[in-house]
Amino acid sequence: MSLVPFSQLWRGVRTRGPVEQASSSSSSSSSSRRTWYAPARSQTGVQVAAYEPTAVLQLAPSAVSRRSTPVRSSIIADLSSSGSGDGEGERGDATGSRDEASSAFAGSSKVLKINIDLLLWRCRTSRIRARQTLDLNERKSLYKAAEDGLRRCLALDPADPRAYVVLGKTLVQQKRYDEARQLYQDGCANTGNVNPYIWSAWGWLEARTGNVERARKLYDAAVVVDGTHACAWHKWGMLEKGQGNFTRARDLWMQGIQRCRRKPQSQNAYLYNALGCMAAQLGRVGEARSWFEEGTRSAEGAASVALWQAWAVLEAKQGDPTVVRYLFRKALGANPRSRYVHLAWALWERRQGNPQHCLALLRRGCELNPTDPALYQAWALVEKQAGRIERARELFEQGLRADPSDLYMWQAYGVMEAEQGNMDRARQLFQEGVWADPRSPSTVYVFHAWGALEWQAGNVQTARELFKAAVRVDPKSETTWASWIAMESELGEIERVDELRIRQAERQWEFVVPAGFTTRPAPGLVDTLARFFSARGFGSDGNGSSSSNGGAGGQQAGSEAAAGIRAADSVDLTVDGGGQLRFKDVERLVESNDLSALPDFLSSDDDVEASLRPPGAAGRRQQQPAGSGTGGDNINGSAGYGKLQVPSLVPRPKATPLRSMG
């Protein structure tokens, strides 16, 4: 019988407190055996057998059976080895072993999901607070706390995709693009390449850094993983639109609407918003209104601030103040602190000649969003226009403290100082603006303003170098080319002017919109696709019926195909133009995610105007009694299409955040 020192016996074994040990030892015999968890240095929990002491000395435990839970040899050696030395040193070794064991055991045990959720919530709160604080040091500390917490989440559960997305967004906000790219790559590998959120976030990063082809592949991977991921469809369409591919962007957004209609979610509203904004950009006001109206019909769309704000901006160009204010109020009802709504509404009130309303909106927007530089810049420009230069300087300084990397703020501040005759101060502001974010494409505005300043000051050579730097950053900047050519023409440099015009023509490219392009699908194409999706079981479901014009015919074809699946392959879909399109052809084209490969179903017999109307509008007009004079009337009292109807479908809110401004 060998005796083992007390401190050595309990090395590496988790025990209870002194009170619990005393109560346990008084009620248990010396031969009672209990099972404890002893941690290993390899972050693996193992079981060892130990005796609970009933006296000062205790018999050494018997050897652990290898038929039970496997135990590493290092742990067995630590538990069975006997040491010599003074008692204080041994107690110190035991204490250190228990502390190390506790931390290792915490990492080895299965982490509850609620603990990760709470940690993610704290990190999200820290990130939001960092974006809302004006103290630079506090902002850095909050970002550091959020990053540390998110990396802790990844250490606890490397397969949780939420931590990768949030941490990547945090890194992108700090312009740490390489780290974010590596993080997304690790996230895809650790989650089995099946999470669309990581793919979509990675694609947005590549699109932001100018890697268009790589972004396309990543967005394609996101929609392959999950066809109902509206975010990927929206970002992919925005990428194609930025490259001038309007048809491809429209097809992607419409395909996203068809796919995501089965899954009601708030992100679907951005697809309608993108189509409406593209129609408004191309001057098709009727189509834009149709998309905005269709998007706001659902509960998710009615709660989307982006739809209401874009609709209000569209109507602001049409000149009806009542409708514009109503739509802006609806936008603030969806998000009372939206910085975009406050800014757009304030600028519109300024154009309407209401400076007090404009200042009230800007003041409220800055109070709700203290770190948004665009609001400070707009407020400063309003004060400058009113002749309050000192107040404008204060607002510019506040905006720079809110976001020192905002190049638009540096440019506007420098232009104001140049207009006041402070040339040296303007040069200093332009230089600091270039230093703030030298890799940003927005530096073209700073270089252009600086070059115009040097041109007016008579420093022609310096102005040439600044204009050259501007076109190097953005070769498509028409304003920079025009200013440079105007300066050379003023100096009489005819040969240099011709050379600049040739260089501009070589570097310029414009978006070419196809002839007859429309964001509303042709009736024949909608009818064919509706029949296809109905036959596949995607027609009208519990989430809401299809809003296409050919929905009734599609439902009938779908019911017939559902009666016999074998007959579906031989169905011929009649096109309005008179041609025949077999069901298998449509199935192959749609499943290939390329609607642009479908033939043009638009014929001379198609009612193009009917396709531009919002779905269901004709039905509502037919159901309305003849004596009623409100259903088909627009704001001005006429019955023609193209005017926004009186927005009485949704009751006007009784209380608005800015009621005094109505």
Curated annotation (Swiss-Prot):
Gene Ontology biological-process annotations: mRNA processing
Pfam family, any one: TPR_16
One of the record's GO cellular component terms: chloroplast stroma
Protein keywords: Chloroplast, mRNA processing, Plastid, Repeat, TPR repeat, Transit peptide
Chain spans, region Disordered: 14-38, 75-101, 540-563, 598-662
Subcellular location(s) of the protein: Plastid, Chloroplast stroma
TPR repeat spans: 126-160, 161-194, 196-229, 231-263, 269-302, 305-338, 339-372, 373-406, 408-440, 444-477
Chief localisation class: plastid
Keyword Disulfide bond (UniProt): no
Basic and acidic residues bias locations: 88-101
Domain of life: Eukaryota
Transit peptide start and end: 1-50
InterPro entries linked to this entry: HAT, Mbb1-like, TPR-like_helical_dom_sf, TPR_rpt
Recorded coiled-coil stretches: none
One term of GO molecular function: mRNA binding
Biased composition (Low complexity): 23-32
Its biological purpose: Involved, directly or indirectly, in the processing of the chloroplast encoded psbB mRNA to its mature form, acting via the 5'-UTR of the psbB mRNA.
Assembly mode: Part of a 300 kDa complex that associates with RNA.
Record's protein name: PsbB mRNA maturation factor Mbb1, chloroplastic
Lineage: Eukaryota, Viridiplantae, Chlorophyta, core chlorophytes, Chlorophyceae
